[in-house]
Amino acid sequence: MAAKDVKFGDSARKKMLVGVNVLADAVKATLGPKGRNVVLAKSFGAPTITKDGVSVAKEIELKDAFENMGAQLVKEVASKANDAAGDGTTTATVLAQAIVNEGLKAVAAGMNPMDLKRGIDKATAAVVAELKNLSKPCADSKAIAQVGTISANSDNSIGEIIAEAMEKVGKEGVITVEEGSGLENELSVVEGMQFDRGYLSPYFVNKPDTMVAELESPLLLLVDKKISNIRELLPVLEAVAKAGRPLLIVAEDVEGEALATLVVNNMRGIVKVAAVKAPGFGDRRKAMLQDIAVLTGGQVISEEIGLTLETTTLEHLGNAKRVILSKENTTIIDGAGVDADIEARVKQIRAQIEETSSDYDREKLQERLAKLAGGVAVIKVGAGTEVEMKEKKARVEDALHATRAAVEEGVVPGGGVALVRALAAIVDLKGDNEDQNVGIALLRRAVEAPLRQITANAGDEPSVVADKVKQGSGNYGYNAATGEYGDMIEMGILDPAKVTRSALQAAASIGGLMITTEAMVADLPEDKPAGGMPDMGGMGGMGGMM
């Protein structure tokens, strides 16, 4: 085992503080509407230019092991805030830096670190509760667009496209972000339920110009097994032919004689039919078939519940207004399912999302939820160069997380004002002893840090602005983009309450741990012997110089 270097007390904390400040100073330059860019060198390719706090934090590693520990702990603050709300990383870093700097001063002055931490925790809980009281629901598109704009570093086009996407697919809908091919951002929306399985045979295509199969007002047969024998299907096909409506078969697979017969019947016009494989695998396939059944008001034909193809009647089939099958995808538009059943299914999937611990499962469940509840929107990000594209895509993803957080827990006035207003909750707060009171006072100063940093980045005097904002009330604050004071919500400067809350909780948590640090252990750097000079080689051929 390698030898270790151990530092104690103030010497350890001083080293840690250097690391905290190096990382936080790089990250906080990006905060606010007039935040600066940070250029990140890559080991290959062009450097990346970003205004995203977490991207800057991820790149920083320091040579000194003890300083690096401080930097990595602040990086953890940014990651925690990002995981909880998808945004607020820079705010969390600024808060953590303020808490650690103030806290270590108090420890150096002889305060009890554990009591300081208890005071900070008490004050944090009170501020979080007050933020909840200050938050207002984020209901309309205008508010959603404003939140998106602020999170995307004051880019209006991003805020507007996210609001439009949410309007089209609903609050529960899936919105994905992809790299586009043009200069402008584009939005495309998939109506109805789409899954990634295409027609089983190109002979089902009835629109040769677009190579899709379109069925108007079809019946849907949903089967959770392979169909290879046409005799099983005959009773259903005859009933559908009599009804004079098209049929879509969704099964584990349709093969051999069964597929050939369906193709022949379709081409001769006896019965208009198309077949597609069921989406997903294993248990997920069964669940997705059940989703389609609920959406279309049909039943899954499964031997597990005593239903077979031979006994299937028209009552077991689902209905939809239209189905479109391409080579890769199938879209079911306007299923005839009962609203109450769909709502119950949505509730069930939501409960599963709450229970699951796997990120992959959660993502798949959310996709299923969106297909039932709303739809799927794709934002294609446009940019002039690849460097700009990466930077812009990261900002769109941030803004999307922020708007989701706003819909979830409401919005508070932005620009660091909400934290200053939440101070009202801790004006009269008292701890159990004097050291806890110092912890509470310490947090009181720290929560002003984001407002001060936004002001400093805009080139104004932080103390003057902070005092003026504190004298105001309600949503009164400072708009760093224009240099004006006024109602932040009316000026469209909003933050999701969840983002502000998560940033403060992450900063107080890690900040409290760093204040109570007494020893640090790191690997000793290995002493490598200095290499000798390389052999100079012969110097022949210089004989006739005399």
Curated annotation (Swiss-Prot):
Function summary: Together with its co-chaperonin GroES, plays an essential role in assisting protein folding. The GroEL-GroES system forms a nano-cage that allows encapsulation of the non-native substrate proteins and provides a physical environment optimized to promote and accelerate protein folding.
Extent of the signal sequence: none
Principal place of residence: cytoplasm
Any single biological process term in GO: protein refolding
Subcellular location: Cytoplasm
Catalytic function, reaction form: ATP + H2O + a folded polypeptide = ADP + phosphate + an unfolded polypeptide
Protein name as it appears in the record: Chaperonin GroEL
NCBIfam families reported for this sequence: GroEL, PRK00013.1, PRK12849.1, PRK12850.1, PRK12851.1
Group of enzyme by EC: isomerase
InterPro entries: Chaperonin_Cpn60_CS (IPR018370), Cpn60/GroEL (IPR001844), Cpn60/GroEL/TCP-1 (IPR002423), GroEL-like_apical_dom_sf (IPR027409), GROEL-like_equatorial_sf (IPR027413), TCP-1-like_intermed_sf (IPR027410)
Subunit structure: Forms a cylinder of 14 subunits composed of two heptameric rings stacked back-to-back. Interacts with the co-chaperonin GroES.
Alphabetized UniProt keyword annotations: ATP-binding, Chaperone, Cytoplasm, Isomerase, Nucleotide-binding
TM segment ranges: none
Record-linked Pfam families: Cpn60_TCP1
Entry EC number(s): 5.6.1.7
A single GO molecular function term of this UniProt record: isomerase activity
PANTHER family in UniProt: 60 KDA HEAT SHOCK PROTEIN, MITOCHONDRIAL
Lineage, top ranks: Bacteria, Pseudomonadati, Pseudomonadota, Gammaproteobacteria, Pseudomonadales
Record flagged with keyword tRNA-binding: no
Family from the record: Belongs to the chaperonin (HSP60) family.
A single cellular component GO annotation: cytoplasm
